[in-house]
Amino acid sequence: MDASHRRVMMASAVGSALEWYDFFIYGTAAALVFSELFFPKYDSNTGLLLSFATFGVGFFARPFGGMLFGHLGDRIGRKPVLVITLMLVGVGTFLIGLLPTYESVGVWAPIMLVTLRLVQGFGAGAEYGGAVILAVEHAPPGRRGLFGSFAAIGVNIGLLLATGVFALVSSLPKEDFLSWGWRVPFLLSIILIVVGFFIRSRVSETPVFSQIAAKNKAARSPVKDAFIKYPREFLVVLGARLAENGLGYLYPVFTLSYMTKQLGLQKSMVLNGIMLAYAISLFTVPMFSMLSDRIGRRPVYGGAAIFSALFAYPFFLMVGTGSQPIIWLALILAISIGNSGMFGPQAAYFAELFGPKLRYSGFASARELGSILAGGPAPFLATWLLGQGNNEPWLVAAYMVTLAVLTAIAIYFGPETYKTDILADKADAKR
């Protein structure tokens, strides 16, 4: 692995770290404090539902960002688009840390919060897809799973950083946490913005896009063409996202709220358990990715989805014991094994599903449409289901099983791609 490959993997990881740091601190703040700061006129359960609704709003902006920046990424190149998306996500998050609360400006506070959430979502719509494509299109044959996993590793780094920062500030006295402590994680995002901009400005354009540009073969309408030429692949991505993205937000966001507010567990204990699970995922994500380079994307992805379906009910039984070691083990099995087993091979798999001229548009658009169905509404729906079940988690567990089973079905009907030529135009091959 030479220096250029290392730069590519760092560039891939740092943007994903920023995106998911930003999104996780928002989700954590929504679970812990936003109901008091931005929706104080409502009872605690309604305020929490409204907080999670603002969390979901950003996901509705993601497909539009995916379509616009995916179009640009297939037209002008992967690198310039990745610099733009990095800045949009980072600046939106930093500004949330400067927002006045409802006590200061009334209804304008949640309006500004939702606006910045939309900015975050718009930029994030093409961030992860572009980071993956940057890595996969630079990868040597037979190592696309490993190279693509660096974007996924960046996700876990971002989640780990976010959890760690929130664990520190949540240990403050409640008055300090509500007055200024919650702002610190958002303001610290400026560090990742600066580092990410420096690294991405030094990385080269991918060899695949360079060949397309040299032959003047860039697609005129890549988003429309991707929908028309890859309908099966779009459906596979949508289905594959249900469990990976839905459970990926339920475990750290909804269950954080459930364990602290319904079970009365300490925030620091739960956050430390989540942080441990993501630390272990730094190793399990590339492990599952490398395994997918050897045996294929579908067996690894589908196997992890089945595991997640089987583990949904045991997860809540383990959490319900109130025992720290058992709760931490539940989080490790759910996040480091079940979710990482899907997330690891996903990067290369989604990139390989689409041909080079439409890859960015197809990947970003399909993936972020999946976000609307999965991660965006997941905490809100889980909170609503919890209320419908008299604060017992079994309806939530059934929802999780449903997501995982649908993902397993989508993977079963999807094509295997780990031996495909990354330069081949699959749409042309179909005709």
How would you name each of these model-derived features?
Residues 155-200:
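Helix-loop-helix hairpin linking two adjacent transmembrane segments in secondary transporters
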Residues 30-62:
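Extracellular/periplasmic helix-loop-helix junction of adjacent transmembrane segments
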Residues 75-86, 294-305:
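Cytoplasmic membrane-interface "Motif A"-like loop-to-helix N-cap segments
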Residues 196-203, 349, 402-428:
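Multi-pass alpha-helical transporter architecture, strongest
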Residues 145-170, 366-378:
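Glycine-rich segments within core transmembrane alpha-helices of 12-TM secondary carriers
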Residues 27-28, 231-280, 375-379:
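Extracytoplasmic gate region of multi-pass secondary transporters
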Residues 299-345:
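C-terminal transmembrane helical hairpin of 12-TM major facilitator-type secondary transporters
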Residues 87-106, 306-322:
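C-terminal ends and interior cores of transmembrane alpha-helices
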